[in-house]
Amino acid sequence: MLGFLSRGPSMKLCMGLACVLSLWNTVSGIKGEAKKEKGMTFLPTTVSGLREEERKEKGVAFLATTELPARSIDLSALNLTELVNGMLSRALKDSKKFFSLLSVTSYSSFAFHKFSVAVYNISNLKTVDPAKFPTRYCYCLNNRTNDLSDFTALLVDIIGNSTSYLTEIFKSTSILSVNQSNESDCIFICVMTGKSGRNLSDFWEIEEKYPIINYTFTSGLSGVLGAATRGTARTSKPTTKSQKTLPSTSPGHWTQSTPWASALRSSPWTETAAPSETEETLNTGRPPELPARATATWFSASHTLPALATRRVARTQWLTADRQTWASISSVPWAQTISEKKPGGSLWETRSSPPTTAGTEEAMNTTSLLAPAAEIMATPGSPSQASPTLGAFTHGTQTPSPTKATAPRYPQTGDLSAEWPFTAGEEPVLVPRPHQVSRCPQPLFKVGAMAAAPLTLAIQRLNPCLMELCQFFQQCLCMSQRSPRTEDMRYCLEYYSWFLKNATYICQRVKRVSHSHTLKQKCLENICKSV
């Protein structure tokens, strides 16, 4: 029967048509599915690409138009301790060579749009014009003073006495160079300040120069460099950085740290005074590390940096000769060095302050991160002798580049080494703050303790405490900086009695200078008003 049906012409025609239709449907289905899959894969790509471009355009437009007032910038968030120590530990790991340059740049006048930290190994740096970068501050690191936890305060203090608000740090370029000399056990981290443009050709030779480590932070709101600054490490050469610095003279290696207690010394660092000012400003001790937004100093297992540093700052003199040479750096322990700029010239003279006498005015500089200030006067003390002049640094000496240093990430809590040194008597702060220790110890406030101590020791003990008080005031009592977060409120409430006791004591001990216009001393005035 089936054979009969298959032999009929009409049936053959129907079977042929059915096969053709079936084949056509199959081909159409395959093409349709392929087209559908292609559309499915293409659509998300197009949408995500458009969204990404749109997001970038909005970000660029925001950064181009937004102007944040300087007073809204929270400088307590500008604590680069963790970043700098991370870079140091990684750059120096398995290497005895030292990098030459740490550059901190920003090109925004009143808004904090971009903040870059780059580490360069410089060997082809041009001569730096002293007229553009006239001021130089140095910080001594050795086996007794190898800590960078006051790095933030150092940056702020450099700029702090030049403007009502700390906008200068955002429109100037601060360059840090690292120098080590055989004549001294110090590794000098020196900072030059000045104004420059974005053109690298002013300072660099034609050859391309790539940073060893480069971090760039961008800020959209007033959070600036707080907890959200987990910046992405970039390895490409920055095209908008102005690089000027002092070259290091010899490759130095990081000196090993001594036991924790051996780092309890403190020495002053220089302050630039205007020619009309006659008072000598003494700055000793360390900046505050109260735990609101300041980051703790994390330690690498191979390079432990003690956290109580001594400061020694030097001033250098620019010499113009056939070869530009950095003149000798005067390091003055326990005394103040003031460098004055000659009104008509670009040369900067270096001089040590005379020994302190009973009639000498000595003021402690307090590092206030955005908090207002007034100079404080300390009781005159015994004369101080200046140390001998250190050897000169010759411009142009080439520093060998360190071994391969990867861009560091922010260390987490698990990266802490076993050498994190805290004693049982020290009081930690509230979780989740970094583990910090107050620098206002109880023995400081015993009756007669300060009167019996020499001037330098008294200032050494008072100054770190005062800076902690300044930071507490900014974070807890300053209305514009007050944080609504629960942990911040708990911290402020719990430590207010500590603030009140220590602030009352310090305000009784010191005397404010009303005509002072420096940023760093305005904090004391507000603290004393609050108590």
From Swiss-Prot:
UniProt region (Disordered), positions on chain: 231-289, 340-362
Alphabetically ordered keywords of this record: Glycoprotein, Secreted, Signal
Positions annotated as glycosylated: 79, 143, 161
Cell location: Secreted
Signal peptide region: 1-29
Entry superkingdom: Eukaryota
Gene Ontology, cellular component aspect: extracellular region
Compositional bias segments (type: Polar residues): 232-269, 349-362
InterPro entries (UniProt xref): HHLA1 (IPR037643)
PANTHER family: HERV-H LTR-ASSOCIATING PROTEIN 1
Protein's UniProt name: HERV-H LTR-associating protein 1
